[in-house]
């Protein structure tokens, strides 16, 4: 009989560091994505792209591939949809688009490649060498020059953003018009993916499951699905025998105080090795 570890997070890289650490220690380890991103406010963005442009904004700032996807979806819709009568289309070809890194630059280049003659597709993409939002903000300040800047910058964001870039640009005299174009939410496939994990042959002889939680928000989302299969509270032997681990104190507090679950192991630091050591220590006490 074996022990299986279920990591409630998407694997990062190949190989994934958490999966590598647990597999090397003899555990059957599976990562299960919990969250997904989805585009939002598509109609509002489409209207903005159609009706605004350089006359309204000094520049556009995009710091994620998802935001690039949102702009591309708006361009696709405008170019492939019905014409807007005699209304003059806005022109974004002369508007600078500032991006973080090569991934976002490549994503915007793909929009232009798909619609090479479109007035909505970005042509002037800058800042690719910036590795972080902070570096990009300083690049924008230098590139646009000294105030005054009467027109705002259009900033496409998700629902979870740090204030670093807006704060730096505001301090430099720029006004931002922020538009949320995507959001992070619980995976629509989580139940299906969980069932698929439980059907894997490698878990057929599992005697004990360790379920590892990585954040309060994902914990809250997953618990209703997990408790259909796992004995999270240690009271129902018809379900899969389970112990609970946490990546750190914030998640532990949520699990104990809000979800009213017992946390059997907590990583002293949020690393694969510290998580593994916490689970091994708990297992040692269990088998004495």
Which residue ranges define each predicted feature?
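Conserved beta-alpha
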Residues: 1-288
């Amino acid at each position: 009989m074996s022990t299986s570890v279920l990591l409630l997070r998407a694997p990062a890289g190949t190989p994934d560091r958490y999966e590598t650490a647990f597999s090397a220690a003899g555990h059957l380890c599976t990562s299960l994505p919990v969250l997904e991103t989805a585009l939002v406010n598509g109609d509002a963005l489409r209207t903005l792209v159609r009706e605004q442009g350089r006359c309204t904004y000094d520049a556009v700032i995009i710091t994620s591939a998802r935001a690039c996807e949102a702009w591309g979806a708006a361009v696709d819709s405008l170019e492939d949809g019905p014409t807007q009568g005699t209304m003059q289309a806005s022109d974004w070809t002369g508007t600078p688009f500032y991006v973080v890194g090569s991934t976002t630059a490549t994503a915007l280049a793909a929009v232009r490649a798909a619609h090479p003659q479109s007035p909505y597709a970005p042509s002037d993409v800058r800042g690719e060498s910036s590795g972080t939002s902070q570096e990009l903000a300083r690049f924008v300040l230098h590139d646009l020059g000294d105030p005054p800047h009467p027109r705002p910058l259009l900033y496409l964001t998700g629902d979870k953003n740090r204030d670093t870039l807006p704060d730096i640009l505001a301090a430099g005299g720029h006004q931002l018009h922020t538009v949320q174009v995507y959001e992070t939410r619980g995976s629509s496939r989580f139940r299906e993916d969980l069932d698929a994990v439980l059907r894997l042959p490698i878990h057929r002889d599992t005697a004990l499951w360790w379920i590892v939680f990585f954040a309060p928000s994902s914990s809250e989302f997953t618990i209703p699905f997990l408790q259909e299969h796992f004995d999270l509270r240690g009271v129902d032997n018809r379900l899969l025998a389970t112990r609970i681990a946490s990546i750190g104190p914030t998640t532990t507090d949520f699990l104990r105080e809000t979800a009213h679950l017992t946390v059997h192991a907590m990583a002293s630091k949020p690393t694969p090795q510290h998580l593994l050591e916490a689970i091994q220590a708990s297992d040692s006490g269990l088998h004495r």
